[in-house]
Design a protein with these regions (language model features):
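Extracytoplasmic mature domains of secreted/periplasmic and thylakoid-lumen proteins
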Residues: 25, 32-93, 98-99
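A post-motif C-terminal structural segment
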Residues: 1-25, 74-383
Length: 383
């Protein structure tokens, strides 16, 4: 179905692989910048995003993320900051944005900014806070912030998937017949790839497919007015296919990396043996019948874990969980090469009305200009 695929460069202004903030700025503002700048150029000058520029053209604007609402990938669409972790600045900008719809998995992260304070700020700015299960109670014309754990690895029964939220938001934003921009980010895919948790990453990729399905259904009803752009802020983990992959293996792992690590920490605190810890790790990733060589690898990782030691090959993560997941991945034809970002090109897919404006797409910073041209404003990003 998707014939228009473009190899896309994602390096930052210094020529290295971009971070979430730098790549988010490129995608939202059309400018390559330094690693941790959000909606600022390399000299710290503020940039105006595609979202703000389209809002000035009377477009409705919606922002959805399955992560925290201050996530550095989506924040440059509405906030300006010189560092990635400035949640108060981001929330303040969100409140001033006047955007029509936001949805996120949570309002804050850590103890730097209490969720209660964020809630108060949003309500004072005229936003209605809506729990995920009440997605269908929202009405056109309202300014809503939907709070819902839409991640496949966290979602509870009865709460909407990321695709459901996308469909609901598109319906609200299009109700008055005017144009709209809806940005949907599945940041959890990046989160799990950084931890080399292939099973959880694959589950979240399937969850993101529900977003694409929702977009395609909307496009089928409005074929002359809808443009779908599917891209990535950057590559992380450098996951490669090394052999024939067994289907469905990722569904057997019921716990995420962090949940598995917490369980092993608890077992260790209760003085369980190495063999018990190894057996628990293997059970959680559904690996059976390990060879002597594989068992020795797990023993070394277990000792490192118990001694609180870190080696480069395990990054900052739990060695035993990482080694168990690596054994599982090897059996399923997958392999990670790093825990960090890479400068590898990503693929941008374009479908729908105005897709011809992307033929010259080379860099992620070209994307907002192409979208603006498709919307009928060819010089919007250069004004």
């Amino acid at each position: 179905m998707f014939k228009n695929r473009y190899k896309t460069e994602v390096i930052d202004a210094t020529g290295i692989g971009g971070s979430a903030a730098a790549c988010g700025t490129a995608i939202s503002c059309g400018v390559q910048t330094k690693l941790c700048r959000m909606a600022q150029d390399v000299n710290g000058r503020p940039l105006k995003s595609l979202a703000y520029r389209l809002k000035e053209q009377d477009f409705k604007i919606g922002i959805i993320t399955d992560s925290v609402i201050t996530d550095a990938t989506i924040a440059p669409f509405f906030a300006i900051a010189s560092r990635c972790h400035e949640p108060e600045k981001v929330i303040s900008a969100l409140c001033r944005s006047g955007f029509d719809f936001f949805a996120a998995g949570r309002l804050s992260e850590g103890n730097s900014l209490p969720a209660e304070k964020v809630t108060e700020s949003l309500i004072s700015a005229g936003y209605r806070i809506v729990p995920g299960k009440k997605l269908r109670t929202m009405n056109p014309g309202e300014r809503n912030v939907l709070l819902s754990l839409s991640r496949a690895t966290k979602r509870q029964p009865g709460t909407p998937a990321l695709g459901d939220i996308t469909a609901g938001a598109a319906g609200l934003l299009s109700a008055d017949g005017k144009g709209f921009l809806l940005v949907v980010s599945a940041g959890s895919i990046d989160y799990f790839n950084h931890r080399n948790d292939a099973a959880s990453a694959l589950r979240e990729m399937q969850n993101f497919e529900s977003v694409i399905d929702a977009a395609l259904k909307f496009a089928s009803r409005h074929p002359e007015e809808t443009l779908i752009v599917i891209t990535s802020d950057h590559e992380s983990g450098e996951l490669s296919i090394t052999g024939k992959r067994a289907t469905g293996f990722h569904l057997k792992q019921k716990y995420t990396y962090l949940e598995m690590s917490d369980r092993l920490v608890s077992l260790n605190q209760h003085k369980h043996t190495d063999e018990r810890l190894i057996a628990s790790a293997l059970k959680m990733v559904h690996v059976k019948n390990v060879s002597d060589t594989e068992h020795r690898r797990l023993q070394i990782a277990c000792r490192l874990f118990r001694a609180h030691r870190r080696l480069k090959r395990y990054g900052t993560y739990n060695p035993l969980v990482i080694e168990a997941m690596r054994l599982r991945d090897e059996r399923n034809g997958l392999k990670y090469s790093t825990f960090g970002y890479t400068a590898k090109h990503i693929v941008t897919v374009v479908y729908g009305s105005g897709e011809e404006h992307f033929r010259s797409l080379k860099k992620n910073s070209d994307i907002p200009g192409c979208i603006a041209a498709a919307a009928g404003f060819p010089d919007l990003m250069t004004r």
